[in-house]
Amino acid sequence: MFWIKEIKSELQKSTKKMKLVFPEGKEDKIIEVANRLQTEGLADVAVLFGTEAEIPNNLVAGIKTIAIKNNINQEMLNLLLTIRKGRLEEDEATLLVQKRNYYGAMLVQMGLADAMVCGLNYSTADTLRPALQIIKTHEDYSIASSVFVMTKGEEQYIFTDCALNVDPNSKHLSDIALMAANFAKDLKFTDIEVAMLSYSTVGSGSGPMVDKVSKAVNRLKAHNEPGLLFEGEMQFDCAYDQATRNKKYPKCKFKNAHPDIYVFPDLNAGNIGYKIAQRMGGFEAAGPFILGLKKPVNDLSRGATVEDIYQTSILTIYQALQKEAK
């Protein structure tokens, strides 16, 4: 993916090295990626293990290793109890921080890491639960969301939300669109055009599913941020194809042949849509990348390849660097 080269270059030039934690140190794929990231100077990497005996001898110099069993302290427990006040007893907190996904999230919350990549041995829910409970969503947004970066040749688009929110309401949809637009800015997109998708194009259909998209569009247009253009509701053919758009939606203000971002109305549509583009359309799908958290945490597919983990890690490090700069 051509955007990876640009991000790598920016990370290598940065005087500020982000700290990335991998909770799943027992995985050979994680060790390979950790070594690569550290060697290339893309981040300061930390890898978690259960015990000292699990730490391999093939880690490159500079990688920090943490054996959780020997590194649970009262400060961490007290912070977790404060964050989860009224929901946890101390013995429950002690058990939680022994889990690598929770320990990693605590390192991020405590500022000992800037970001986390996890999921080879965890479901998406088990990766995101500690992130949502401990790191929490950013105060600007009502929910967390996800994006896929879809690439084919010189074409590059962002699809959202294809992994997290089952049936977002109009407020959620507007937040999903804004998060994706800000993510696109971080990836150096300019004059960003966002299509709010539906089975209806500006009133050609009706029903609650259409209403929530049109309400989200109205909310977004009131946002009125320079460099961002939101249009809809519209069908996918109208959004993607300029000739169809000219017929179905002549008042649409999109100037590009194709908009940059496609916001799906629910998880059914989004998940099916990105997989059709990937399998039938020949697009490479990078992600999902999680948006809306106060600090970056990204989820890996349990079938992720070394290259998948590497690309996700680079983007996660970059997300952390962008948050540092804001």
Question: Model-derived features: where do they sit?
Answer:
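Anion-binding alpha/beta catalytic cores of soluble intermediary-metabolism enzymes, centered on
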Residues: 1-256, 260-326
